[in-house]
Design a protein with these regions (language model features):
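Structural signature of tandem-repeat unit edges
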Residues: 43-47, 61-75, 85-97, 106-118, ...
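The feature captures the LRR N-terminal capping module
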Residues: 29-53
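Generic detector of contiguous secondary-structure segments
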Residues: 33-36, 108, 494-501
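Consensus positions within tandem repeat domains that build extended binding/scaffold surfaces
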Residues: 78-80, 99-102, 120-123, 142-145, ...
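Eukaryote-biased recognition of intrinsically disordered, low-complexity regulatory segments
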Residues: 52-61
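Beta-rich interaction/scaffold domains
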Residues: 1-31
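Hydrophobic alpha-helical membrane segments of integral membrane proteins
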Residues: 36, 530-531
Length: 542
C-alpha cells in the first residue's frame, strides 16, 4: 500500500513540472489570407474550403521560362497560363485539379502530375514540346488528350484504367510507356506511334479498332486477358515479331495486315477471323492449331509469301483470296472443306498435289497460276468455277468424277495436260481447255455441248471422239494444227469457223463416210460440209 502511494505521488510531481500543451487546428483568418496574397503578388487566388484556387497570374510572368507556384495552390482555373509560349517548366506536383486550356499553347517540356486524378483534353492542348509525363493518380485519359504530341517520349500512367479514342494518336517519338493496369484502350489511341517498341497490356480486356495501327517499331506486345482483336488493331506494325494470340477467340478485319516480321502464330482458341486479317505478312511461315476455326475469311492470308505450314483439316469454307499468292505453301488438307472460294489459292506456286476429299464446289480462279500443281483428285467435286485452274502449267491429268460442266477458262494454258477423263461431263464452256498444248486425244462421247474456242490452240490434238455431241460453237477447235481428220457424227448444230487455222485437217467425215450425212448436215468428198436446212456451206477444206 505504501509502495502504491509513492508511485502516485511520483507521477503527480512529473505532471506538475511538464509544460501545458493545447492541441488545436488553427483556423486561417482573413489576416492570414491577406498575408499569403501579400507574399505572392503575382498570383491571384481564392480559397474554397481547404483548397486554394489559382484564378489568374500577373502578365509579367508571360515572359518567364520557369514559374514556381506557391506550394499551397491545389487547383488551377481555366486558361490561366494559356498562350504562355515561353513557359517551359512549372511545378505541378501538388495540383489536384486543372481547368480547361489552363496550359494550352505553352512550351512545357515535362509534366509531373502527382496529385491529379482527372485531366481535361484541352488542358495541355497544343503543348507540342512535352517530352515526359508522369501522372500516377490518373485513371482515365480522355479522347485526343495528347494527340499529335510529336516530342512526347515517355509516359508513366500506372493507375490508368482506360485510355480513350485518339489519346496518344501520332505521338511519333513515344518510346517508353507504363500502362500496366489499363483495362480498355480506345480506337486510334496509339496509331502512328512510330517509336513504341514494347508494350505490356496483360490486364486489358478490350481494345478498339486501329488502336496500335502503324506502330512500325512495335516488336513485342503482351495481351493475355484479351479475347477479341478488332479491325486493324495492329495493321502496319511491320516490326511486330512476338505476340501471343493463344487466348484470342475473334480477330477482326485487317488486324495484322502488313506485319512483315511475324513468323509464327498459335491460334488455339480462334473461332472467327475477319477479312485480310494477316494479309501481306511476308515473313509468316507457320500457323498452328486452327482447331476451332471453321471458315477462312476473304483475303485472310493473302500474299503471305513465306507461309509453308498450316493445318487446315477442320476448315469447311475458304473465302475469296483466302491464301492467294502464298507462293511457299506446299500442301493443303481439305479433310472437312465443302467449298473453296474465288481465287482462294491462286498463285500458290509451290503446291504440287491436292486431294479435294469432301469439296463439292471450287470457285472462280481458285487455283489460278498454281504452276507446280501436278496431281488433282476431284473426288466429290460437282462444280468448277471459271479459270479455276488457269495456267496450272505442270498439271498432267484430270479425272472429272461427278462434274457435269467445265466452266469458262477453267483449264486454259495447262500446257502439260495430257489426259482428261470426262466421265459424266455434258458441257464444256468457252476457252475451257484452250492452249493445252500437250493434249493429243479427246474422248468427248458424253459431251453434249462444246463452247466457243473450248480447245483453241491445242496444237498436239490429233484425235477427237464426239459421237454424242449436239452443239459445237465458234472456233471450238481453231488452231488445232495437228488435227488431220474429224468425224461430225450426229452433231445437230455447228457454228462458224470451228476449224479455223487447222492447217493439217484434210478430211471431214459424218459417221465414217466422206459423203455421209446426218439429220442436219451432209459432207461432200470429205471437204465440204453443208447445212441441210438451207443448203448453205458451213465448212470448206477444198
Amino acid at each position: 500500500m505504501k509502495l502504491k502511494n509513492k508511485a502516485i505521488l511520483f507521477s503527480t510531481v512529473i505532471l506538475m513540472n511538464l509544460p501545458l500543451v493545447t492541441l488545436s487546428c488553427k483556423k486561417i483568418t482573413n489576416n492570414d489570407f491577406e498575408e499569403l496574397k501579400k507574399n505572392n503578388p503575382n498570383f491571384n487566388f481564392i480559397k474554397e474550403g481547404i483548397d486554394y484556387i489559382l484564378k489568374s497570374v500577373d502578365s509579367s510572368l508571360k515572359e518567364k521560362e520557369e514559374i514556381n507556384l506557391p506550394n499551397f495552390i491545389t487547383k488551377i482555373s481555366d486558361k490561366v497560363f494559356k498562350d504562355f509560349k515561353k513557359l517551359r517548366k512549372i511545378n505541378l506536383e501538388n495540383i489536384k485539379e486543372i481547368g480547361k486550356e489552363a496550359f494550352s499553347n505553352t512550351n512545357l517540356e515535362e509534366l509531373k502530375l502527382d496529385s491529379l486524378n482527372k485531366l481535361d483534353p484541352s488542358t495541355f492542348l497544343g503543348c507540342k514540346s512535352i517530352t515526359k509525363i508522369n501522372a500516377p493518380k490518373l485513371e482515365t485519359i480522355e479522347s485526343k488528350t495528347f494527340q499529335n504530341y510529336e516530342n512526347l517520349k515517355e509516359i508513366s500512367l500506372e493507375n490508368v484504367k482506360e485510355i480513350k479514342d485518339y489519346a496518344f494518336y501520332a505521338c511519333k517519338l513515344l518510346k517508353k510507356i507504363n500502362i500496366d493496369n489499363v483495362k480498355k484502350i480506345g480506337a486510334y489511341a496509339f496509331k502512328y506511334c512510330y517509336s513504341l517498341k514494347n508494350l505490356n497490356i496483360d490486364k486489358v480486356q478490350k481494345i478498339e479498332e486501329y488502336c496500335f495501327s502503324s506502330c512500325t517499331s512495335l516488336e513485342k506486345i503482351s495481351l493475355s486477358n484479351l479475347k477479341e482483336i478488332p479491325n486493324e488493331a495492329f495493321s502496319g506494325c511491320t516490326s511486330l515479331n512476338n505476340i501471343d494470340l493463344k487466348n484470342i477467340e475473334k480477330i477482326g478485319s485487317y488486324s495484322f495486315m502488313n506485319n512483315k516480321s511475324l513468323a509464327s502464330l498459335d491460334l488455339s482458341n480462334l473461332k472467327e477471323i475477319g477479312t485480310s486479317a494477316f494479309s501481306n505478312c511476308y515473313g509468316l511461315e507457320t500457323v498452328q492449331n486452327l482447331n476451332k476455326l471453321k471458315e477462312i475469311s476473304e483475303g485472310c492470308f493473302y500474299e503471305c509469301t513465306s507461309l509453308k505450314n498450316i493445318n487446315l483439316k477442320n476448315i469447311e469454307v475458304f473465302q475469296l483470296n483466302a491464301f492467294s499468292s502464298c507462293s511457299s505453301l506446299e500442301t493443303i488438307d481439305f479433310a472437312k472443306a465443302k467449298s473453296i472460294g474465288n481465287n482462294a489459292f491462286s498463285k500458290c506456286k509451290a503446291l504440287t498435289s491436292i486431294d479435294f476429299k469432301n469439296v463439292e464446289k471450287i470457285g472462280n480462279g481458285a487455283f489460278l497460276g498454281c504452276s507446280n500443281l501436278k496431281n488433282i483428285d476431284f473426288n466429290n467435286v460437282k462444280e468448277i468455277g471459271q479459270a479455276a485452274f488457269y495456267e496450272c502449267k505442270a498439271l498432267t491429268s484430270v479425272d472429272f468424277k461427278k462434274i457435269e460442266k467445265v466452266a469458262n477458262r477453267a483449264f486454259i494454258g495447262c500446257e502439260s495436260l495430257t489426259t482428261i477423263n470426262f466421265n459424266n461431263v455434258k458441257e464444256i464452256d468457252e476457252l475451257a481447255f484452250s492452249r493445252c498444248e500437250s493434249l493429243t486425244l479427246l474422248d468427248l462421247k458424253n459431251v453434249k455441248k462444246i463452247g466457243k474456242k473450248a480447245f483453241w490452240n491445242c496444237t498436239a490434238l490429233s484425235s477427237i471422239d464426239i459421237r454424242n455431241t449436239e452443239e459445237i460453237y465458234d472456233e471450238a477447235f481453231s488452231g488445232c494444227s495437228s488435227l488431220v481428220q474429224f468425224d461430225l457424227k450426229n452433231v445437230k448444230k455447228i457454228f462458224k469457223n470451228i476449224f479455223l487455222e487447222c492447217e493439217a485437217l484434210k478430211t471431214i467425215l459424218i459417221n465414217g463416210n466422206k459423203n455421209g450425212q446426218n439429220n442436219n448436215y451432209k459432207v461432200i468428198d470429205g471437204k465440204q460440209v453443208y447445212d441441210k436446212s438451207n443448203n448453205s456451206l458451213i465448212v470448206d477444206l477444198s
